[in-house]
């Protein structure tokens, strides 16, 4: 049986919020089977729990932001969610003492390292997957994203930037996640931004925590980071990383084929909402056989609970 996963033990880290630049403390805690992923604002009294669910995504302007009915929010959740998806964590309590998750180095890799350091524990309940049965597509002008039936999880993603430094890199990438590709191929891809946009955001009291330590920064012609890129196609791979995190708001790993062109947080969420609303297009599946093989490769090792 392919089992649900949580952490073996709690683990904490400290970082900086991207938009306000404040120090943020983050703790990841184990959770019982069938809990899901819960963000907990421990800076509030009483604490407020916000589940990672597609219908709670109510702001996608600069990042993915969860907002509950009382207007309590947790922002910049997508990189952490991508790490949880890539490692295959189903259940966790995510404690944070701010309205935004720390940006760390702008990628998912620090969160992957945290999860690996905490250890992965398999639970007694079967892991649920969302299997795509029928195509679902959303469009916004020339941008589009679609989910198609597929045995496993595959992404074909394309971006289209006229910037010379981005045009010189690969703007199309295809990855089949039946191989253990997320940690090696995707997790280290950093967010990126343009100096002219960053200056505007800071004038409006945003992106105050942004720096060369947590983003790839470009001027009109070139990459300004002295250490260059981590992948030749880091720009499109970061957009893929964002999509993985955004789609994990469905609460389960997807078995299907994501194809996307110039998709961002808003379109990713629209696609997930459209999928969940069209009940004939998907189904929950589990793999209960004793020798069942996971259709998506997740990081190992893991220990088994009683």
From Swiss-Prot:
One Gene Ontology term, aspect cellular component: membrane
Identification of the protein by name:
UDP-3-O-acyl-N-acetylglucosamine deacetylase
Q: Tell me, what is one Gene Ontology molecular-function annotation carried by this entry?
A: metal ion binding
Q: What does this protein do?
A: Catalyzes the hydrolysis of UDP-3-O-myristoyl-N-acetylglucosamine to form UDP-3-O-myristoylglucosamine and acetate, the committed step in lipid A biosynthesis.
Gene3D superfamilies linked: lpxc deacetylase, domain 1, lpxc deacetylase, domain 2
Name the residues that bind Zn(2+). Answer: 79, 238, 242
Q: Where is the active site?
A: 265
Cross-referenced InterPro entries: Ribosomal_Su5_D2-typ_SF, UDP-acyl_GlcNac_deAcase, UDP-acyl_GlcNac_deAcase_C, UDP-acyl_N-AcGlcN_deAcase_N
Question: Which reaction(s) are listed as its catalytic activity?
Answer: a UDP-3-O-[(3R)-3-hydroxyacyl]-N-acetyl-alpha-D-glucosamine + H2O = a UDP-3-O-[(3R)-3-hydroxyacyl]-alpha-D-glucosamine + acetate
The biological pathway it contributes to is: Glycolipid biosynthesis; lipid IV(A) biosynthesis; lipid IV(A) from (3R)-3-hydroxytetradecanoyl-[acyl-carrier-protein] and UDP-N-acetyl-alpha-D-glucosamine: step 2/6
Keyword Zinc in annotation: yes
Q: Tell me the keywords, alphabetical order.
A: Hydrolase, Lipid A biosynthesis, Lipid biosynthesis, Lipid metabolism, Metal-binding, Zinc
Sorted alphabetically, the Gene Ontology BP terms of this entry are: lipid A biosynthetic process
What species does this protein belong to?
Idiomarina loihiensis (strain ATCC BAA-735 / DSM 15497 / L2-TR)
- Kindly list any coiled-coil regions of this protein: none
Q: What is its EC number?
A: 3.5.1.108
Cofactors that this protein relies on? Zn(2+)
The Swiss-Prot or TrEMBL record describes its family as follows: Belongs to the LpxC family.
On whether Transcription is a keyword of this UniProt record, the answer is: no
* First-tier enzyme category under EC: hydrolase
Question: Which branch of life, at top level?
Answer: Bacteria
């Amino acid at each position: 049986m392919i089992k649900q996963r949580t952490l073996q033990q709690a683990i904490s880290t400290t970082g900086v919020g991207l938009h306000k630049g404040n120090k943020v403390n983050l703790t990841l805690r184990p959770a019982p089977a069938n809990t899901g992923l819960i963000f907990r604002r421990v800076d509030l009294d009483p604490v407020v729990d916000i589940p990672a669910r597609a219908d709670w995504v109510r702001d996608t302007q600069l990042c993915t932001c969860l907002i509950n009915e009382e207007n309590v929010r947790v922002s910049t959740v997508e990189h952490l969610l991508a790490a949880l998806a890539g490692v295959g964590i189903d259940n966790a309590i995510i404690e944070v003492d701010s309205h935004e998750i720390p940006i760390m180095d702008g990628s998912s890799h620090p969160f992957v390292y945290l999860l690996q350091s905490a250890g992965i524990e398999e639970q007694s309940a079967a892991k649920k997957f969302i299997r795509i049965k029928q195509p679902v597509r959303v469009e916004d002008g020339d941008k589009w994203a679609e989910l198609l039936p597929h045995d496993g999880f595959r992404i074909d993603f394309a971006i289209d930037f006229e910037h010379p430094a981005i045009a010189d890199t690969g703007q199309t990438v295809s990855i089949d996640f039946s191989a253990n590709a997320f940690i090696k191929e995707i997790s280290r891809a950093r967010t990126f931004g343009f100096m002219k946009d960053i200056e505007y955001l800071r004038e409006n009291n945003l992106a105050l925590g942004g720096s060369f330590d947590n983003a790839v920064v470009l001027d009109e012609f070139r990459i300004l980071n002295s250490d260059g890129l981590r992948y030749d196609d880091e720009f499109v791979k970061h957009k893929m990383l964002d999509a993985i995190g955004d789609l994990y708001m469905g609460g389960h790993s997807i078995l299907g084929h994501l194809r996307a062109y110039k998709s961002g947080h808003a379109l990713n969420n629209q696609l997930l909402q459209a999928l969940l609303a069209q009940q004939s297009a998907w189904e929950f599946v589990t793999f209960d056989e004793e020798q069942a093989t996971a259709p998506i490769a997740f990081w190992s090792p893991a220990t088994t609970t009683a």
